[in-house]
């Protein structure tokens, strides 16, 4: 199977889609990305994965595999404490001590 088909299969069957929402630093709340994460992860692990994949370390985070950027413009800041992740119908906020259900 070619890479595009495999990636699409994974996103449809093997992975869940979570939304990353920027709320911190006085931002107007908005969805910045959808991140595909393994279905077998715990919800807080899905939040961790989405957080990690929306951090710019060696490259712009929106270029990471499994990330679909949803922002307007040329770029977006990295996900930080105070931002939120929506997993299914449950919203989590990134606190200094981990993930808390909102």
What is each model feature region?
Residues 1-64:
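N-terminal non-globular leader segments, chiefly Sec-dependent signal peptides
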């Amino acid at each position: 199977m070619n890479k595009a088909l495999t990636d699409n299969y994974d996103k449809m069957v093997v992975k869940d889609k979570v939304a990353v929402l920027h709320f911190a630093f006085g931002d107007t709340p908005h969805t910045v990305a959808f991140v595909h994460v393994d279905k077998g992860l715990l919800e807080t692990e899905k939040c961790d994965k989405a957080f990690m994949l929306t951090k710019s370390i060696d490259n712009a985070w929106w270029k990471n595999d499994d990330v679909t950027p949803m922002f307007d413009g040329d770029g977006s800041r990295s996900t930080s404490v105070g931002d939120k992740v929506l997993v299914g119908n449950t919203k989590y906020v990134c606190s200094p001590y981990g993930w808390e259900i909102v």
